[in-house]
């Protein structure tokens, strides 16, 4: 499945919630879902059909995929890995997604959205333990230090972001704003993931 390249605001309207795909715009009155809180398309306002159980499960899976910017094949791979781990499958799945480098970069405040974080990672602006990593899906581990590459600190976009760095990261990571680094101090717990996700619906879908 090809990566979606269309208007991302349509995705938020389709899922009926903010997915925070456009950075700062999502926090302003320009956010599309604030102005048009209904599904996109000609019949978006008139869709009154009650969704099926499968439809509800599918929408939840699509919502999580879109939040983290993961394609179907890779998402299924995460699910299979989560299913092999000990513990609750749905929570294992969310932990894997949270550990992605692009998500960590976003949570540390080095990008205003996950899509922007993914792009910055791909362009080689970040290091892990001093070594450049340009793979957005790289899974961080406890003890890893994620930092902005020294040469990248003077790039216009990162310079702008770092000059107003004020995000408070989740408790499983610590931020050193002066050094532009973040340290993974623990693996994320379910309560650390402040997203309206019902992961059990995803498990039910894949268990059909």
Swiss-Prot record:
Keywords, sorted A to Z: Ribonucleoprotein, Ribosomal protein, RNA-binding, rRNA-binding
InterPro entries, alphabetized: Ribosomal_uS4 (IPR022801), Ribosomal_uS4_bac-type (IPR005709), Ribosomal_uS4_N (IPR001912), S4_RNA-bd (IPR002942), S4_RNA-bd_sf (IPR036986)
A Pfam family: Ribosomal_S4
GO molecular-function term, one example from the UniProt record: structural constituent of ribosome
One of the GO biological process terms: translation
Residue ranges annotated for the S4 RNA-binding domain, each copy included: 99-165
GO cellular component: a single term: small ribosomal subunit
NCBIfam families linked: PRK05327.1 (NF003717), rpsD_bact (TIGR01017)
PANTHER family, alphabetized: 30S 40S RIBOSOMAL PROTEIN, SMALL RIBOSOMAL SUBUNIT PROTEIN US4M
Protein family membership: Belongs to the universal ribosomal protein uS4 family.
Function (record text): One of the primary rRNA binding proteins, it binds directly to 16S rRNA where it nucleates assembly of the body of the 30S subunit.
Summary of subunit composition and partner proteins: Part of the 30S ribosomal subunit. Contacts protein S5. The interaction surface between S4 and S5 is involved in control of translational fidelity.
Name of this protein: Small ribosomal subunit protein uS4
Organism from which the protein derives: Desulfitobacterium hafniense (strain DSM 10664 / DCB-2)
């Amino acid at each position: 499945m090809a990566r979606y390249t269309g208007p991302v605001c349509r995705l938020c309207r389709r899922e009926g919630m903010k997915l925070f795909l456009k950075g700062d715009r999502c926090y302003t009155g320009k956010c599309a879902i604030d102005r048009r809180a209904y599904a996109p398309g000609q019949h978006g306002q008139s869709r009154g059909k009650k969704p099926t159980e499968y439809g509800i499960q599918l929408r939840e899976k699509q919502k999580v995929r879109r939040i983290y910017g993961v394609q179907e094949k890779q998402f299924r791979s995460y699910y299979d890995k989560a299913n092999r781990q000990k513990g609750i499958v749905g929570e294992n799945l969310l932990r894997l997604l949270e550990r992605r480098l692009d998500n960590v970069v976003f949570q540390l405040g080095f990008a205003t959205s996950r899509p922007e974080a993914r792009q910055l990672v791909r362009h080689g602006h970040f290091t892990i333990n001093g070594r450049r990593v340009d793979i957005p899906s790289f899974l961080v581990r406890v003890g890893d230090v994620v930092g902005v590459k020294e040469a990248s600190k003077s790039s216009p976009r990162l310079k702008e972001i770092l000059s107003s760095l004020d995000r408070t990261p989740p408790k499983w990571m610590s931020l050193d704003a002066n050094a532009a680094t973040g340290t993974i101090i623990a693996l994320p717990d379910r309560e650390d993931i402040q997203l309206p996700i019902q992961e059990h619906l995803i498990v039910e879908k894949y268990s059909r």
